[in-house]
Amino acid sequence: MTVPLIHSRDVLESRLKEIPAEPGVYLMRDATDQILYVGKSKKLRSRVRSYFRFTSDLSPRIQRMVAQVCEIEFIVTDNESEALALEDNLIKTHQPPYNVLLKDDKKYPYLCITWSEPYPQLYITRHRRLDRNQDKYYGPYTDVGLLRHTLGLVKRIFPLRQRPKPLYKDRTCLNYDIGRCPGVCQGLISPEEYRKTLTQVAMIFQGQTDELIRELQEKMIQAAEQENYEAAARYRDQIRGLEQLGESQKVSLPNSTVSRDALALAMNDSRACIQLFQVRAGKLVGRLGFVAENRGDDPGLILQRALQEHYQYCDPVEIPSEILTQYELPDHDFLESWLSQKKGRKVSLVAPQRQSKAELIELVERNAQLELTRTQRLADRDAAALERLAEVLDLPDVPRRLEAYDISHIQGSDAVASQVVFIDGLPAKQHYRRYKIRNPEVRPGHSDDFASHAEVARRRFSKMTPEDQPDLVLIDGGKGQLSAVMAVLADLGLDHLPVIALAKREEEIFLPGNPVPLRLPAQDPARLLLQRLRDEAHRFALAFHRQQRKARQHASTLDEIPGLGKYRQKLLMEEFRSIARIQVASEDQLAQVPGIGPKIARQIYRYFHPETQAESPETAQVE
């Protein structure tokens, strides 16, 4: 079927009648069979019908989606809990473009522990990677300075891996000598022992510092009774450090033992801002912000969606025993049961009436209102910038979808390109694309940005569909790059697309057929928007270039190992993911990789640990 259902009422009614009034999941597809949206409902028929009954009441974004729907699929489940789990899996698998209910507020940092690695790292990040299920994220934290201070204290209290990569191949660095690192780079501590230390560190960021102190106090007493005074002193120093850490944490709430989350929102006609405050052991340790589109839904339903999306991705230990909400949630009993099952113990959902709990909700609501004001100001700024852009470029309509392209290389080596997309002035990362330049003329020692831009333009726009047609294309460069792209578009019959180039030096805007560049004032909203778009394309291209260069350098390192061909190199990289991890792996760990075996493992280990060859009886000279 290629005709949207909204244009064929008979077909639509027939299709809706086929959908049962049972719990389950529905999938909406477009003319190309792409999944546009995945949803779940207690009554599938009623929920799906609501999209087509009063379309004028839908938000502009959902109206655009409904106008593309050509087919509706459904999967019936036994209950709503199964539907929720299935919806989650389908969204993760297909990543439908209209399933962006909530957007993480990226200004809040997390602490990540990479449990997926043999020797986990601790680092601060603003992006949660959901594709690595073993890694754990703690936070978010409102004060990145305090988080860095906390992490610095933790690394002084516990001997931890201090670097992402070893400083030396054949010896430890100063951190080992002063007791800051247990010698991870040289395998002086086993992964099992190191993970025991990381488990203690994780307790700090789970709000279990008091419990950890009690555990260390018991170990200190045991060590002293066994006359192991060195270990006892180490535990004593760790306890003192943890007590110092507790003093530097955020303001305590009246009950110093309580752990709970609190959700509240503020909304206007277009959007809702949700805030989630995290209280652990009586301390306000984190805050998470979401922005949701206001589709005219009840505030309680918006809060419920935010709660579901947040806790779907949480580790059970991150779910507190009590969650406060500003409003009573429509599916209160179901959600309470779902959260309790996920955590493995009772979780209470409460819309508080008591003074102390109500005051916490009021605090969260005030913060949500402040965030709504800030978000609306940014949205107004972007809307004004887009209107100004249409004015200065003489566009027929205010542009919604902006695309930018940049090339990144070092003298022609590892040449790549980026495509970034802004929709309504904001990054739409699900539409970002990366390209490896295939042109044989672009090679180390010989760069050609014109040819690279032409290649990317042909690869992108020869496959363009009406749904992903840009309203404006920005090329990073000058007249030459613009001419190269326009020649390709003319060849494809697409030279009607609005295309401009932005030169870095003077921030001049070049338009096709106009030899005189357009110069806008430094604070012009249109210029600032184009600069943000161009800079994002540059960042994305540079990150991909560095990734490709690093992979090539890693491959060249492995090429030097005798008997290690491309296939085995691939096996190693799939298992360890980096040269640094291969370097610190033991001979037994290397041999356990399928396709490697003891003999090749020995050669790999000796390459990274040349001192072992002198100690090996196989290499000793016979006298």
UniProtKB/Swiss-Prot annotation:
Transmembrane segments: none
Chain ranges of the GIY-YIG domain: 21-100
GO BP terms, alphabetized: nucleotide-excision repair; SOS response
MF-aspect GO terms: DNA binding; excinuclease ABC activity
Location of the protein in the cell: Cytoplasm
One GO cellular component term: excinuclease repair complex
Residue ranges of every copy of the UVR domain listed in the record: 210-245
Family matches, as Gene3D superfamilies: 5' to 3' exonuclease, C-terminal subdomain (1.10.150.20), GIY-YIG endonuclease (3.40.1440.10), UVR domain (4.10.860.10), UvrC, RNAse H endonuclease domain (3.30.420.340)
Keyword set, alphabetical order: Cytoplasm, DNA damage, DNA excision, DNA repair, Excision nuclease, SOS response
Family matches, as HAMAP family: UvrC (MF_00203)
Family: Belongs to the UvrC family.
Role according to the record: The UvrABC repair system catalyzes the recognition and processing of DNA lesions. UvrC both incises the 5' and 3' sides of the lesion. The N-terminal half is responsible for the 3' incision and the C-terminal half is responsible for the 5' incision.
Assembly with partners or alone: Interacts with UvrB in an incision complex.
Protein's recorded name: UvrABC system protein C
Organism for this UniProt entry: Synechococcus sp. (strain JA-2-3B'a(2-13))
Gene: uvrC
